[in-house]
Amino acid sequence: MLNCIYTRKLRHNCEKSNLKIQANVRKNLVLVGMMGVGKTTLGKIVSKMTDLKFIDTDANIEKNCLMKISEIFKRKGEKFFRLEEKKEVLKLLKESNSVIALGGGAFIDKTVRDNILKNAISIWLDTNLKDLNKRTKWNNKRPLLNKENNQKEFNKLYE
C-alpha cells in the first residue's frame, strides 16, 4: 500500500499544472483513509490527470438507496449502510481503470480490505488529527460525527 500525504499545496500544484498522466492501469486505484482526509477531492484530481473514471462509493450508495448517507444511518442504521457499502465496493472492484474514493470506514471490513489488497492498487491518504478535525468539525453529512461528543468520537476513530 502506498502512503500519501495530501496537502493543499499538492492539490494546487496538480490543478495548476494541468498535467496529464498516461495511465496504463489494469487495476483500479482505490483511495483509502479517514473521513475528511481528501479522498474525493484528490480522486477527482487524479481522475482528471489520468483520464480514468472517478467513482465515489458514498455517492453511489446514496444514488442506489435514494437517500443521503445521514438519512440511511437514521432510518436503516449503520449495519445496513455497511452492508450496502460492502456490496458496492465488491461490485466496483470487478471493473477496472477507475479511481475509487472509498468511504472512511469501508476499509475496516476484512472482506473489503482483502479484496482491495488483492484486486486493486490501494493508496492510503493520511494527515494529522488537527487537520482532520478542522475538515470534519462542522460537516453534518458525516453520521458517525453527529453525536454530542463528536470530537471524542472522531479522535477514537482516528486511533
Please report, for each region that a protein language model flagged, where it lies by residue:
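ATP-binding Walker
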Residues: 37
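ATP-dependent small-molecule kinase phosphotransfer cores
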Residues: 53, 57-106, 110-117, 142-143, ...
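Walker A/P-loop
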Residues: 40
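Hydrophobic anchor at the beta1->P-loop junction of P-loop NTPases
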Residues: 31
